Structure formats: C-alpha cells, structure tokens
Amino acid sequence: MSTSVLYMSMSLDGYIAGPNDEPGNPGGDGFDRLHEWFAPGGGEFVRPSGQAGELFDEMNEYGAILAGRRTVEQVDHWGGDRHGVRIFVPSHRPPGPSVANYPLVTYVTDGIESAMAQAKAAAGDRYVLVHGAYTAQRALEAGVLDELVIHQIPVLFGGGRRQFEVLPSRVELEIVRVINTPEATHLHYRIRR
C-alpha cells in the first residue's frame, strides 16, 4: 500500500507562503526564499549535493499527487502533467471546463478520504505527494496523511499563509529522520495513530 507524504518548505515561524499570496503572485512575497535549497534564485530545480540531494531524489519518487484546488489552480494544474503521474484534487465543486483537456487530473467531490484512496491506488508502490495547506490539514483531520517532511528554512516571514493554521486536535508525531544542511533542517515525521 502506498504512503501519503506532505513535503513542504516552511519558514521557522510556520509560513509556506509569504504575504500577498494570490494568483498573480503565487506563493506570495519571498516565496522563492523557501525553495532556495533546491531552486537557487527561484530558478530551475537543481539537485543539491550531499544528503539534501538524496532528499531531493526521494521527493521526486512519487506515484500520484493529491493537491488542493487553490494550489492546482494557481499553477494551472501543472499544464495537466506533473511528471506523468495522476493528480487528484479534492473539491466540493466540479472543475471548470478547461480541466477536460487534462486527462491526468481528476477532481474528487466525495471527500478527502475518497480522493486519498484513489491517489494511493494510482501511486501503486510509490508514495502520494500531498500539496496544499488546507488539503494537508483536512487529510490530517481525516487520518489519511501518513508522513510529513518539513524543510525548515532559517528565515522568519512574519506573515503569509501557515501550513498548520487550523488543526482539529493535537497530532502526535514520530521523528523518522533529521538532516541538517546549511540551507535547511529537513525534518521527517511519521504520524502516530
């Protein structure tokens, strides 16, 4: 069975997007700073050296994506193809007509549990990459998110969009691995059930 993993770069004060996060400025002001560990200067993804490179490789071994509607709409559903894997979008409403041009994108309107089950089935023996603050929060609440990999960036944003703004209750975590690099502290947790 596949595992679901939230991979997220985050400021020390918990922000995954800076102020002014909107469609014309996805990720908000300062967003590139959160991803410099693998995309220097906000440019193309570059495999880092050492242990960060190993994490980068792991991060790209997903077999399906579960992403929130806001996330996929800001990036135009990655043009309908994110490395050839299926993209599942839990949503309370059906997609707009342009999504019909993206056969790998599936909107799931019968709940986060169904969306995750479909994503895990599509992922096979690889993991499901989870994208989006709200979607990750709902997956935690429903008990269908298995692991967190947080790339803690040494910066304080002071505002923007937080990853864990609202949680239904306390969530206990097991530390799987901690890797320190000059650009980030990479924290891998398993969710205790």
Positions of predicted regions on the chain:
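Enzymes that bind and transform nitrogen-containing heteroaromatic metabolites
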Residues: M1-R193
